[in-house]
Design a protein with these regions (language model features):
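Aromatic- and acid-rich polysaccharide-binding/catalytic face
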Residues: 345-346, 352-356, 415-449
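Beta-rich carbohydrate-recognition modules and glycan-binding surfaces
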Residues: 26-218
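Aromatic-lined substrate-binding rim segments of carbohydrate-active enzymes
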Residues: 262, 266-313, 361-394, 450
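Aromatic-lined carbohydrate-recognition surfaces of secreted/lumenal glycan-active proteins
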Residues: 233, 306-317, 373-419, 465-477
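Catalytic domains of carbohydrate-active enzymes, especially glycoside hydrolases
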Residues: 243-268, 343-344, 433
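Active-site groove signature of glycoside hydrolases
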Residues: 261-266, 332-369
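Substrate-binding cleft of secreted/luminal carbohydrate-active enzymes
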Residues: 438-445, 459-656
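Boundary/entry segment of secreted carbohydrate-active catalytic domains
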Residues: 40-44, 209-252, 263, 645
């Protein structure tokens, strides 16, 4: 089981059942209840027949993988759920299946009073696999757990074999509320490698009721290979060294990379912001490395690879800095105008990530940032269409159209062009293509790439505008120490961003240091990432930067909160200690090097969650996930391909 996730757009995958049908099924009187109530056949997407979801269950060092597969099924058609667990001591792994829509705020639980058995079918890859069956009612949901009802061997006396067997779990002796059943968990609690296939989960009135077989489902049309895109940030050796260029393009051809998003820069790049520079009134300049680009692009075109100019920075989203990215757009257009057709860029792609700006945490400022961001992209698209034959696109996160847990509002909602909707939908309406940073280390499940990408693809199919690339992450960053100032309550934080700290609202870096914000539910704490081994000069700069943040956005710099600064600190420490993205928190006094004044603060180590990257996935497992993603996403007309972030880490994974 799991706690409820952020509410999302409630769309049933592949149109299998409408929400009205799901509710009607639940409201049917007991006399009309079918002998067999199907919960999950795994045939049609991630959401099941009663509105629930499934997802892998894991805690490091255990690794779990789930996939809906068509090669091992009950009967002649359909899908089953393949569950693979490498169970290690100290972790846990398996799969959970909910009987309610955990993405709907007030979703009803499942009433199974009229049923005597939970039923599901299982077969092993080798036989002998061991696991424990757990069930949960509504009371177990807040505990993020389920009640063990017995090892699988209790219900299968001969154990798991390589043939399909039905598991029947009697409900009469289970001490749960059968009027409000929440889910099923299969917990692989024996150390070792296990792979089983699960199918046709449901409830039966009697043990003799036959579980129907899947008759037919519409499978996606499978292709031998699918087009892909790839980000490339460190481009110099690829465009300037002939042998490396050949090697790079050979790799692209082998991996079916048809579109490259490659970092460009201008001759006068000193004018570009280091992270905190204010508005730059005039930014003009020619593209750097023109001769190298001409040679490289011509070579790429000869092997069927498109090249798009890539640039981006969070501060570019803000209106006062639009002249910088627009200068890049103009420079690429000018370069194309003076180049032969085979030497021209095929497009321009911006990766700005405006949600990294400090002001994003204030809803009013967030909407301003998003309006500015949309205005930038609309103008960039206009220039590209008016002055070239290129395409224009931008990267977005997958979660702007998900709802905030506290407000119920879309995370990226904004009024623009007479419509109030998520910025992701606005961008799909106006641009040639969109790269969705759909960063998860699994395709399947409630928290997988398919679930997070399908509402955007459905919208794009309906609107028939932008093509969508589904991004996948293969990089990982090492743990980074972050120093925080003891922060302010949300109201005071937002007031300061509009007042004394207004100059920080539109920054993602302060004095060159990348910022991080930790929200403990009551207070917002701003910090900076430290270099791995700061020099004495950097240490002085760190102290001055922390003092600046403390005076503007810290408890010790706010007259009304200053006396409670250490209380704020005591409140945040246990909360950041329980957050999986952080470890080793401890209090730290911040000293201003200018006047030696002290500010309350703390430090913690930032961790990249394994679930957002395939960096820890083996190459064969990565191939399987990519194949699954491409087959599932290809159902959508707007799907343009997977987009791989980024070249060096993906190549290292391929060559493991």
């Amino acid at each position: 089981m799991t706690t409820r996730l952020q509410p999302a757009l409630l769309l049933v995958l592949w149109g299998s059942l409408s929400l009205m049908e799901l509710q009607a099924q639940r409201d049917v009187g007991s006399a009309a209840r079918p002998d067999f109530l199907l919960v999950a056949s795994f045939d049609n997407g991630v959401q099941n027949a009663v509105g629930g979801y499934h997802n892998k269950l894991e805690r490091a060092p255990t690794v779990s993988v789930t996939a809906r597969v068509a090669d091992v099924v009950r009967g002649r058609s359909g899908r089953s759920l393949k569950v693979s667990v490498d169970r290690k001591a100290g972790g846990f792994g398996g799969v959970w299946i909910t009987f309610y829509n955990l993405k709907q705020k007030e979703s009803p639980y499942l009433d199974v009073r009229d049923y005597a058995y939970l039923s599901f079918w299982v077969r092993g890859a080798r036989g002998g696999e061991q696991l424990t069956v757990k069930l949960a009612d509504a009371s177990w949901v807040p505990r993020d757990d389920a009640l063990p009802v017995g090892p699988l061997s209790l219900f299968l006396p001969k154990g798991v074999t390589t043939e399909w067997q039905e598991v029947l779990v009697p409900l009469s002796g289970v001490k749960l509320n059968l009027e409000a059943m929440a889910g099923l968990t299969l917990d692989f609690d024996v150390v070792g490698r296990h792979t089983v296939y699960v199918d046709d989960v449901g409830f039966k009135q009697t043990a003799s009721v036959v579980t129907p077989l899947t008759q037919h489902i519409d499978e996606p049309v499978r292709k031998r290979e699918y087009d892909r895109a790839m980000w490339d940030w460190n481009i110099l050796s690829h465009i300037s060294d002939a042998s490396r260029m050949t090697d790079f393009l050979t790799f692209c051809k082998t991996e079916n990379i048809k579109t490259l998003w490659m970092q460009v820069s201008l001759e006068n790049s000193a004018l570009l912001p280091e992270g905190v520079r204010g508005a730059v009134k005039e930014v003009t300049g020619a593209l750097r490395n023109k001769a190298e680009w001409k040679s490289f692009i011509a070579a790429a075109h000869r092997v069927g690879v498109r090249v798009e100019a890539l640039d981006g920075f969070p501060e570019y989203a803000v209106k006062q800095n639009h002249n910088i990215p627009l200068a890049v757009v103009d420079a690429v257009i000018d370069y194309n105008g003076e180049s032969r057709p085979e030497e021209r860029f095929d497009g321009i792609h911006l990766d700005n990530e405006p949600y990294l700006l400090i002001g994003w945490r204030d809803w009013t400022i967030r909407e301003q940032i998003l309006r500015d961001f949309l205005e930038l992209n609309q103008e960039a698209q206009r220039r590209v269409r008016q002055h070239s034959h290129m395409v224009y696109g931008v990267d977005i996160p997958f979660w702007w159209q998900h709802r905030d847990q506290q407000t119920g509002e879309f995370n990226g909602v904004v009024d623009y062009n007479g419509s109030r909707q998520p910025a992701s939908f606005h961008l799909i309406d106006m641009l040639d293509n969109v790269g969705v940073m759909n960063y998860r280390n699994t395709v399947d499940g409630a928290d997988g790439m398919l679930e997070h990408g399908q509402d955007l693809l459905q919208y794009a199919d309906k609107r028939k505008r932008a093509k969508l690339f589904m991004g996948m992450e293969t990089s990982s960053f090492p743990p980074a120490t972050v120093w925080f100032v003891a922060g302010l309550p949300r109201k005071e934080f937002e007031e300061r961003l509009k007042g004394e700290a207004a100059d920080l609202a539109f920054r993602s870096r302060v004095n060159g240091f990348r910022t991080q914000i930790f929200d403990d539910g009551t207070n917002l704490h701003v910090g900076i990432e430290l270099p791995p081994t700061p020099t004495p000069e950097e240490q002085t700069k760190i102290g001055a930067t922390m003092a600046e943040i403390a005076e503007k956005l810290g408890a010790s710099g706010h007259p009304a909160v200053k006396s409670r600064a250490w209380d704020v600190l005591n409140y945040v420490l246990p909360r950041i200690a329980s957050d999986p993205e952080w470890k080793s928190p401890r209090a730290r006094s911040i000293t201003n090097p200018a006047d030696r004044s002290q500010h309350a603060g703390f430090e913690a180590v930032s961790i990249m969650l394994p679930k957002i990257t395939f960096a820890g996935t083996s190459h064969p497992e990565l191939r399987a996930e990519m194949k699954m993603a491409e087959e599932e996403f290809s159902r959508y007309q707007s799907y343009a391909g997977l987009a791989i972030h980024y070249y060096e880490t993906y190549r290292a994974k391929v060559e493991e």
